[in-house]
């Protein structure tokens, strides 16, 4: 008997309060690393009505105007009208950054292996910036090897922002959320059950002042300008039974930091796989690549994606764990949920042979310190909204499939009978 179930993932637009904070944190990271690639950064941001607070730890030789960076990012997102309670030009921006603890710095700068063995291996010079566990995931549900629910939710959120910024739907505000419920049968997506969009909007739309008429127009416009375009060419499409919910509270005029406070690192499931895979709990934004919450999660995605792309599994989850100041992972685990076509013990051996999972090795393989300067001062901030994985609009090193051939070659004789 086939098993039928529903799975839901959500996304938010770049104007969501928490995502404003993530983007400012990563804009600061970009600016600092572009000027001094060896910087240590842990930038946290809080927003509320008319207020931005930048806090955290920072060790750098760079001279960065953090207030200017924050205002520019807020303007780019679309908060330019003080009448909305939050504006790039009028909000207060406070900065309270401390230097990184020397107790942490000594462990990150000189790994425990090097101190014990006096090794000259440069990849052992940088230990993990903290203890912890990280996950990466990939599956064959979409061309970008992402779970379908989060892929669709992100595409809807991005399209929602695009039609606002282009002026196609000028009455939309920057704040918004999307949610997609996918129908599965025997683990395969077969349909779309529900699409939910909540979007900030103006009090009136043209001559329309009645809220019932306003909400009807918003729903009709979003169906034609946002939802249908996202599903063009989709392998799983809309149907007559698909439910569409738009602004189900009835109104969404007050939004952004005026409607809700924001904080860096509160959208970690949206940043990753939409709840489809496990999560180690660590956020990404505002953290330099010595923080394994970020860099090791990217490496795990790289491993999982290449495994699935090589046809070795239909879905793959990779976990690593670290001890602070120690370069080599404490543990590495690969889970393929019964879909692996080769011996899993042999697969783990090959992964550990060909994928660099030490923090310094990850940084070197992906060039994580230098990408901000190489890309005109912006790299991390472009992932701070709409996800860090499966981004076909960005050139992300952990999304490359350059390990597929070596995996196939090494595992050609390890096929499970």
Curated annotation (Swiss-Prot):
Pathway where it operates: Amino-acid biosynthesis; S-adenosyl-L-methionine biosynthesis; S-adenosyl-L-methionine from L-methionine: step 1/1
Subcellular location, record wording: Cytoplasm
Any single Pfam family the record assigns to this protein: S-AdoMet_synt_C
EC number: 2.5.1.6
CDD domains: S-AdoMet_synt
Binding site for L-methionine: 57, 100, 260, 291
Ligand binding (ATP): 16, 175-177, 251-252, 260, 266-267, 283, 287
Assigned keywords, A-Z: ATP-binding, Cytoplasm, Magnesium, Metal-binding, Nucleotide-binding, One-carbon metabolism, Potassium, Transferase
Known cofactor(s): Mg(2+); K(+)
Function statement: Catalyzes the formation of S-adenosylmethionine (AdoMet) from methionine and ATP. The overall synthetic reaction is composed of two sequential steps, AdoMet formation and the subsequent tripolyphosphate hydrolysis which occurs prior to release of AdoMet from the enzyme.
PANTHER family on file: S-ADENOSYLMETHIONINE SYNTHETASE
Family under the similarity heading: Belongs to the AdoMet synthase family.
Protein name: S-adenosylmethionine synthase
């Amino acid at each position: 008997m086939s098993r039928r179930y529903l799975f839901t993932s959500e996304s938010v637009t770049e104007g969501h309060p928490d995502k404003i904070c993530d983007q400012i944190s990563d804009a600061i990271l970009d600016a600092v690393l572009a000027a001094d690639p060896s910087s240590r950064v842990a930038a946290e941001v809080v927003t509320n009505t008319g207020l931005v607070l930048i806090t955290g730890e920072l060790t750098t030789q760079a001279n960065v105007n953090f207030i200017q960076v924050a205002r520019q990012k807020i303007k780019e997102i679309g908060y330019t009208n003080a009448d909305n309670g939050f504006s790039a030009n009028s909000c207060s921006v406070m900065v309270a950054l401390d230097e990184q603890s020397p107790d942490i710095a000594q462990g990150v700068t000189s790994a425990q292996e090097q101190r014990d063995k006096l090794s000259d291996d440069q990849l052992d010079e940088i230990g993990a910036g903290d203890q912890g566990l990280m996950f990466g995931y990939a599956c064959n549900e979409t061309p970008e090897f992402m779970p379908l629910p989060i892929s669709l939710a992100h595409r809807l959120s991005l399209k929602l922002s695009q039609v606002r910024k282009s002026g196609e739907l000028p009455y939309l505000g920057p704040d918004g959320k999307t949610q997609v419920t996918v129908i599965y049968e025997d683990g395969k997506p077969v349909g779309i059950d529900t699409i939910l969009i909540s979007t900030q909007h103006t009090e009136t739309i043209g001559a329309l002042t009645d809220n019932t008429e306003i909400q009807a127009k918003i729903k009709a416009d979003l169906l034609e300008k946002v939802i249908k375009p996202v599903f063009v060419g989709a392998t799983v499409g809309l149907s007559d039974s698909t439910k569409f919910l738009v602004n189900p509270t009835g109104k969404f005029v007050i939004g952004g930091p005026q409607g809700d406070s924001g904080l860096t690192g509160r959208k970690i499931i949206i940043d990753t796989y939409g709840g489809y895979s496990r999560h180690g709990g660590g956020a990404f934004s505002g953290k330099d690549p010595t923080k394994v919450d970020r860099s090791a999660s990217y490496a795990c995605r790289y491993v999982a994606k290449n495994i699935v792309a090589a046809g070795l599994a239909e879905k793959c989850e990779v976990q690593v764990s670290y001890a602070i100041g120690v370069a080599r992972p404490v543990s590495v685990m690969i889970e393929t949920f019964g879909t692996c076509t080769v011996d899993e013990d042999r697969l783990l051996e090959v992964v550990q042979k060909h994928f660099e999972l030490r923090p310094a090795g990850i940084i070197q393989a992906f060039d994580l310190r230098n990408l901000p300067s190489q890309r005109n001062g912006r790299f991390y901030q472009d992932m701070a909204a709409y996800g860090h994985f499966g981004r076909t609009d960005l050139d992300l090193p952990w999304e490359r499939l350059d390990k597929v051939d070596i995996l196939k070659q090494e595992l050609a004789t390890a096929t499970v009978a």
